[in-house]
């Protein structure tokens, strides 16, 4: 049975969205609560659908039609979100997430814009073999960098690691990644990049750093105001990047 083929152009099983419900441009936070924060930046924001961990809002930012859909935590649910959004017309995706840095030069409140992700997860291996790279769309990466620079936000461009097991990352494991020059960790981006590539979509990620696992700064400090600031900056940069891409501002256009 071709589940994907059967759901093209239909109301989607998990996200409960159908044709016409979503825009070409989509922001993908993990947290449903972050969808509400994104909606605060949108004109005419309205709730489109909610089912399980998937909350979807739609509105406009600087004239650009934008959808925000939460993916939940991890690659399996992120893959479902991307597939189902693409089935009903979404084409450009920017993940707006949080991240734990392992590069000691990356501070809480900074942004990380990945140019690649190590596939330390299981979902992408159902799509492509070992050794296949997980890389974002260059035009979107450039638009994110330009947006961060325009706002004067401190950002880092580099490789991240997408991991499955939040509590199983040992000090030795993190040190090995740090020696490779890995900037930070997340739990969704590598699968986002792989699925987008296979489906002919555009995808990138911007991450707000909420802790540094090497220095210990911010680890589990849930009330740290820098966490909220990091998320706000990531949202702003992602929205501005979409506006730049829509205008064709040197990033390929939509």
Question: Which residue stretches match the model-derived regions?
Answer:
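Generic non-transmembrane alpha-helical segments
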Residues: 143-151, 195, 237-245
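His/Asp/Glu-rich mid-to-C-terminal helical/loop segments that flank catalytic regions of hydrolases
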Residues: 215-254
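A C-terminal functional module that forms or caps the active site or interfaces directly
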Residues: 171-212
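Generic structural signal for well-ordered, non-membrane alpha-helical segments
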Residues: 28, 32-35, 71-78, 133, ...
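Flexible, glycine/charged-enriched surface loops at secondary-structure junctions
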Residues: 45-50, 152-159, 245-254
């Amino acid at each position: 049975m071709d589940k994907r083929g059967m759901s093209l152009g239909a109301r989607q099983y998990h996200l409960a969205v159908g044709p016409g419900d979503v825009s070409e441009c989509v922001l993908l936070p993990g947290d449903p609560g972050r969808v509400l924060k994104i909606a605060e930046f949108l004109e005419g924001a309205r709730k489109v659908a909610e089912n399980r961990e998937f909350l979807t809002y739609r509105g406009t930012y600087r004239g650009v039609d934008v959808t925000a859909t939460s993916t939940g935590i991890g690659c399996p649910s992120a893959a479902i979100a991307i597939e189902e959004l693409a089935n009903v017309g979404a084409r450009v995706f920017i993940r707006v997430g949080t991240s734990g840095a392992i590069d000691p030069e990356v501070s809480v409140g900074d942004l990380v814009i990945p140019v690649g992700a190590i596939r330390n997860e299981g979902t992408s291996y159902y799509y492509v073999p070992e050794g296949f790279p997980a890389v974002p769309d260059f035009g979107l990466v450039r638009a994110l960098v330009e947006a961060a620079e325009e706002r004067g936000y401190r950002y880092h461009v580099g490789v991240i690691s997408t991991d499955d097991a939040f509590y199983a990352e040992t000090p030795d494991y993190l040190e090995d990644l740090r020696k490779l020059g890995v900037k930070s960790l997340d739990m969704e981006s590598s699968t986002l990049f792989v699925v987008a590539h296979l489906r002919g979509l555009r995808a990138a990620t911007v991450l707000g750093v909420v802790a540094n696992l090497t220095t210990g700064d911010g680890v589990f400090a849930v009330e740290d105001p820098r966490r909220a600031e990091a998320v706000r900056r990531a949202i702003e940069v992602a929205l501005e990047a979409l506006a730049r891409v829509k205008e064709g501002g040197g990033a390929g256009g939509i």
